[in-house]
Amino acid sequence: MARPNPIIPGFNPDPSIVRVGDDYYIVNSTFEYLPGLPIYHSRDLDNWALIGHVANRPGQFKGAGVKPPGGAWAPTIRYRDGIFYVVVTDFFGRGNLLFTAENPAGPWSDGIELAIGGIDPDLAWDEDGTCYLSVSGLSLGSHEGFEGHNGISQVRINHITGEVLEEPRHLWQGSGLMFAEGPHLYHIGDYWYLLTAEGGTDRGHAVSIGRSTDRKSTV
């Protein structure tokens, strides 16, 4: 049987997915448009239904006056200990934000501002419960282009309060293409895998993955 492609038609860029039991949830970028950060649900990965939005009221995002290409960039959705998390960049707005909800359909929190620059944030947990936030190294509001980009960086954070617990450390520059972005970190077996996008957003766009037995040093 042919599977539907696209699985979610229309304007749904930068998908992030999480599995919770038999359920799958996807969140997407929405940039300057509100309501923002739609949450889709499926049980078979083929048929998806919109169940809510993370950003659906004033104050969660800067919103008014944000022009392209500002707004919600490259969210990540995760689940841990009964709580759903969405971490996202409000570009030209509030910066990197952490939203939480007990029900993925909402309501979602107002969003905690994270004291770290960069874009395309990701969350991952170690076996001992330590939470790591990874970001692409483009400065918020920067107009420097690719020259000032410093690859993928990472910090430990308190995922309850949003407190950043250490200075950012460099994790990976990428495979050699320019502008490593969109990091997603996974701990599978003996390895940490760092999935990234590279090469800009034109014809050279690519997906790269590095792995390491040491979370602090992806190779």
Task: Give residue spans per PLM region.
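Carbohydrate-active catalytic/glycan-binding domains of CAZyme proteins
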Residues: 1-219
